[in-house]
Amino acid sequence: MSTEAANVQTLKEAYRRWHDSKGASVDYWFDSVVAHHISFGSVPRGAAPLKFAAQYNNDVELRGYFDGLLSEWSMEHYAMDEYIAQGDVVVARGSCAWTHKKTGKLCETPKVDYWRFKGGKAIEFYEYFDTAAAAAAAT
């Protein structure tokens, strides 16, 4: 299996578990996908009301993303339907829906994740989603 195919397979399995567990598979991401020194970013860049969606520079800090996400939101679905791989980069495209626990509002959004791998582990990640819809659901 090529490195590109292996990286795609790693992500397919992680996203499958993420969806099936409704977000309870955080440890799998850390054990099987994320490198210790990952650069992890998100379009909101930590702006309220999506403070957890910020820049993280290692796996220890990155726990804050998942803690914030899962304490504030409940996953409805998460589906990555398309993967594009070139060299050490994989782009995953799909959609997800989350309900904000405090407001009860639903956010459905297209989702694009950019990944860069080295030695089978993700060293860079950046996510793109409808931040206006997420902010509206959170307020």
Task: Give, region by region, the residue ranges found by the protein language model.
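Hydrophobic alpha-helical core bundles mediating ligand binding, dimerization, or RNAP-core interactions
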Residues: L11, Y15-W18, V34, F66-L69, ...
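A structural signal for well-ordered alpha-helical scaffolds and beta->alpha junctions
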Residues: E4, V8, K22-G23, D59-F66, ...
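Short, low-complexity N-terminal intrinsically disordered segments enriched in polar/charged residues
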Residues: M1-S32, T139
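A solvent-exposed, acidic/Ser-Thr-rich amphipathic alpha-helical stretch
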Residues: Y28-G87
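Generic anion/oxyanion-binding catalytic loop in active/binding sites
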Residues: Y15, K51, G104
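Hydrophobic pocket/interface hotspot
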Residues: L11, S25-F30, V34, I38, ...
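A beta-strand edge to alpha-helix "cap/lid" segment located at domain peripheries
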Residues: S2-A5, D67-T139
